[in-house]
Curated annotation (Swiss-Prot):
Subcellular localization, as worded in the UniProt entry: Cytoplasm
Cited function: NAD-dependent lysine deacetylase and desuccinylase that specifically removes acetyl and succinyl groups on target proteins. Modulates the activities of several proteins which are inactive in their acylated form.
Organism: Pseudomonas syringae pv. tomato (strain ATCC BAA-871 / DC3000)
GO CC list: cytoplasm
Protein name (database record): NAD-dependent protein deacylase 4
Length: 256
């Protein structure tokens, strides 16, 4: 890991840009994994649209309740924990994630930017007002179930997940904040993202264009073509642990 450690040696501002691969090691299913029987006939992406919710609200709401329970039972892994540890080394670390779970926050990262929203923050499908669920409204069997969405206390519209569905735009303020962080970082470390979902996939390119070093961490080679771009193939927990170890050693040597 000498090369990435050397690339990060003079960095002060680091952006973690994370995707599904970082949470997969905590047991969070990805689109490639087998779904529970109730939803097995469906492509998960087909359930993540406003039209799907209009046509089958109980199917879609039940799907998201099951996913939320899956996240609640999961624990942050070493790849989530490394970012607060890097803060302790003196780096200014920001997290921009495509994930809708809260594992970064539970690992100790603060002010996480969720490009695609969050499972923990439902809202009204009609008036878009944020809502909170009671514990009984979050109950769902292990095998999943069709569940009619609760109603908004304000307008009686159906509650929907507070995530960005396919065909919907990212919240302008969220995207603006993410781009600002990326344009001003010294290094961007992309972890577990395929780099195909736009506009999120543009962030590494924005970082490169702004002169930052970009390090890709993935179980498959997603390509690194620019002079200031590195590709590290491996599990996020393993690769990031080695990077952190190298940086810690470097800091200790500098202080010694």
């Amino acid at each position: 890991m000498r090369l990435p450690a050397e690339a990060l040696k003079d960095a002060r501002k680091i952006v973690c840009f994370s995707g599904a691969g970082i949470s997969a090691e905590s047991g969070i299913l990805t689109y490639l994994d087998q779904m529970p029987k109730l939803w097995a006939p469906y492509d998960p992406r087909a359930l993540e649209t406003a039209n799907a919710f209009r046509e089958s609200p109980a199917l879609v709401w039940g799907w998201y309740l099951w996913r939320r329970r899956q996240v609640d039972r999961a624990q942050p892994n070493a790849a989530h924990l490394v970012w607060p540890q890097m803060v302790n080394l003196g780096y200014e670390v920001s997290v921009v994630t495509q994930n809708v779970d809260d594992l970064h926050e539970r690992a100790g990262s603060t002010d996480v930017i969720h490009l695609h929203g969050s499972l923990t923050m439902p809202k009204c499908f009609a008036c878009h007002r944020p809502a909170e669920l009671t514990s009984d409204q979050m109950e769902i069997p292990d095998e999943g179930a069709l569940v009619e969405p609760p109603r908004c206390k304000r307008c009686r519209g159906k509650l929907r997940p507070g995530v960005v569905w396919y065909g919907e735009d990212l919240p302008p303020g969220t995207w603006k904040n993410a781009v600002s962080l990326v344009k001003n970082c010294d290094a961007l470390i992309s972890v577990g993202t395929s780099g195909v979902v736009t506009p999120a996939a543009d962030l590494p390119h924005i970082a490169l264009a702004s002169g930052a070093t970009v390090i890709h961490v993935n179980t498959v080679d997603v390509g690194a073509q620019a002079a200031n771009e590195l590709m590290l193939v491996g599990r996020a927990t393993d690769v990031l642990a080695k990077i952190h170890e190298s940086l810690s050693t470097g800091k200790n040597n500098d202080n010694g």
